[in-house]
């Protein structure tokens, strides 16, 4: 089921956006539109769906429009054309066409945000920060304390509940931000580069924690990042943006194997694709011989991760037979792996 959808959404900053929209329809670039009109094109004709329980990463360079599109989910960006639909308890809600009460309900109960700059209240305790949204929503104190305690336990900060947030490290403060977002019970989580200000080791640890939380909570997450490794590590799908336009959306595997254009190819050229590829991506098709009748050092299935194939070859050099229904349908040698890992670069150079 679709949790969020963008249908031909355009976002323009400035007065009289219709002049910019006309130039968008003519295929003009953001720079051309800005020079001619003085307006800033945030997003142009974006169409995208995010499914329930999915982590979709908006990826791009600074100024590509990813954070602007993210903010359209809860009505914080000036959408001037197109439709935004957010699945709420009462049905789909367009934050730009609903009444004020429906918009408040959307922001209070359906959508939560986690920011890069943690946006915590330094004069309040950890527990008070986690429960701040619940307090604003009018939740009774006893119920609020119970909910806050559950979220602090989830993010392993129970012992810090009564400390001021400025006593915590950066990574711990971001966990407070996560707990605050989780506490509302909102099914949709907007995360705007939440880990980019942290040290690499802490960032990796929080990525692992987010994936663990996701396995338990099954949120719908729209995640903004300019870190390619982060995007490919946590995203079920990735939408790559340039100058306000969505260039390609697909699984990490799809994007590595088939970049849509030179911009995407440049993005992924320095990525190690080994974590996205499987045996099927690099094998040499072979005849349907039985595994017993063909000389191979080991066998594996087509869906076996390539990293596991490498481990097998390290233990038993030779060729790995790829088996389907008891017959070998292909083989993989060390050279096949090298070719598979560099294929996306060769495509780019061509």
Describe the residue ranges of each PLM region.
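Helix-to-loop junction immediately C-terminal to a conserved catalytic motif
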Residues: 74
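Conserved ABC ATPase signature
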Residues: 164-168, 172-174
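Conserved ABC ATPase "signature" region
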Residues: 23-32, 87-94, 131, 135-138, ...
